[in-house]
Regions:
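HTH-adjacent hinge/linker in prokaryotic transcriptional regulators
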Residues: 2-23, 28, 34, 38-99, ...
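Conserved phosphate- and dinucleotide-binding cores of soluble alpha/beta proteins
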Residues: 2-12, 19-25, 30-32, 45, ...
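Pocket-edge structural micro-motifs
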Residues: 60, 102, 209
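Gly/Ser/Thr-rich loops at beta-strand to alpha-helix junctions
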Residues: 104-107
Length: 251
């Protein structure tokens, strides 16, 4: 297959689902990983896509309604999420009562937990998170409610009622987008409601967001920028520091 033909197929796939991992593209085009990475580099230079760690996305738009699958999210920005997760794990004390939000960045945090952090107690609405925490021997609470298939997050009235019964020393949150003027946002209103309820019960809140999520706006508002500190690999715009505390893992 000629390079131009591969370019067209890559852009066609992105037009349909907005994001794609290198592995997805290899399978779709029956091409090697090295070939796909060269193609992504060239298309990125041409401004036709944004190359990110583990795959590619269409050029950013100020407002988005798309939502990648849970599996796709876990394949994107892997190293960034790992560095953020390690920094977040170091903030957890044995006596903490933690809320751990559903999402790929917070799942990376669950994987990174070790030592004293394993003695903390956790409440999470992420099914995969609860399973992993339990496997690590943590004390973990999983609220009841409706399971949302796209993210494997527990949502709905029952989840809201359960979360409102707790007080958290720290909350570690995920968001699909963070933007000046729009705050922290996510595609689904019911997930946003659960996130907001947990934030309301937390003494300290950290949003784990990699640099690809800045300047992205989704339909459902979680909270404004003042409501939580940001833990990121890199903040692309210093203006965000006017609104909240930001800790970067890349110095």
């Amino acid at each position: 297959m000629l390079a131009e033909e591969r370019f067209a197929l890559i852009l066609d796939l992105l037009a349909r689902q907005r994001t794609a991992t290198v592995q997805e593209l290899c399978e779709a085009l029956n091409a090697s990983e090295s070939t796909i990475r060269r193609d992504l580099n060239e298309l990125d230079k041409q401004g036709k896509l944004n190359k990110v760690h583990g795959g590619a996305t269409l050029p950013d738009s100020p407002f988005r309604t798309d939502e990648p699958t849970k599996a796709a999210k876990e394949e994107l920005a892997v190293s960034q999420k790992q560095s953020i997760a390690q920094a977040a794990a170091e903030l957890i004390l044995p006596e903490d009562f933690i809320y751990l939000d559903a999402g790929s960045s917070t799942l990376a945090l669950a994987r990174a937990l070790s030592g004293p952090a394993l003695n903390a107690s956790y409440v999470t609405n992420g099914v995969a998170h609860a399973r992993l925490l339990a496997q690590k021997g943590c004390r973990v609470f999983l609220p009841g409610g409706l399971l949302r298939p796209q993210t494997e997050a527990i949502i709905g009235a029952a989840a809201l009622t359960a979360i409102q019964q707790y007080n958290f020393t720290k909350a570690f949150m995920g968001a699909n987008g963070v933007a000046l003027g729009s705050g922290f946002t996510t595609p689904d209103p019911e997930e946003a409601a659960v996130k907001a309820a947990a934030l309301h019960r937390a003494r300290e809140a950290w949003f784990l967001v990699d640099d690809t999520k800045f300047a992205q706006v989704y339909p459902a508002v979680i909270c404004d920028l003042h409501s939580g500190a940001i833990l990121t690999n890199k903040c692309p715009n210093p203006k965000y520091r006017q609104y909240t505390l930001i800790k970067e893992t890349e110095v």
